[in-house]
């Protein structure tokens, strides 16, 4: 008897890949990828708020534990089959890259640099994802694709540099490492989601991390939580539920449908969504330069999409 798709994961969450309609799959991939990027855009501002009151290592382990418990409940409730023996190693790579590596390295980096400073490195994430898509996913974008990808990354980095950056070698190194492990985790997860399913990949990766994250989070927990403010708790909830789980459901599905290198270029928009979010929450002014660069980056994303295959 065929397994019925759970209603909770209908719409963009469903496995909708159709080999008979690659154009529809590509469009769905870009839609799912865009939703994922919007969700991820709140990650750095939320992490910045949370790390002011939570120790970075504990924050990383706690968010992974909370998301992992929820992921385990979903897998049990929907009676998902266990991954095959060949799929466990890629799941470990995903867990090390996006469940532990990127959250931990960014949390540590944000002790040294501001969210605006980190835009320089987030601007390199689409390029890193595309490179690992070639190395791990076997993709072969056309040469013009790389031109648009590098140009888009340069625009984002140039805009961030124009805002003024302070010297923080430790923070810079941590952010660079975060981008590399995240790009690997994105590409590996997207490749695996073609056979395992988008939401299943991130759920199993979170479950893989539980035996480490759960006991360590209990060991490193502070003696009391009485001094933690409501914004810090809300930030923890966001990075645990949205950044660690829901965002990846859309993101991995989008990468699998539309191509790792191609859909990965949507990440060029993430810094600007993050700045817009900061402006809305913190009432910071959005400059004309930000608007102009955003338009130019959208053009690079469109160009990359056209020449991705």
Model region roles, listed by residue range:
Residues 38-39, 43-44, 72-122, 158, ...:
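Specific transmembrane alpha-helical segments of multi-pass solute transporters/efflux pumps
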Residues 71, 129-131, 135, 149, ...:
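Transmembrane alpha-helical segments that form core, pore/gating elements
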Residues 15-22, 62-64, 232-234, 268-309:
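C-terminal-most transmembrane helix of multi-pass membrane proteins
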Residues 2-61, 104, 108, 164-191, ...:
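Glycine-/small-residue-enriched transmembrane alpha-helix faces in small-molecule transporters
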Residues 61-62, 103, 117-124, 188-211, ...:
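Helix-helix packing/entry segments at the starts of transmembrane helices
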Residues 38-68, 114, 184-209, 222, ...:
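Juxtamembrane helix-loop-helix junctions in multi-pass membrane proteins
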Residues 71, 92, 132, 141-161, ...:
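Hydrophobic transmembrane alpha-helices of multi-pass small-molecule transport proteins
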Residues 42, 46-49, 53, 67-84, ...:
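Membrane-interface helix-cap regions at the ends of transmembrane helices
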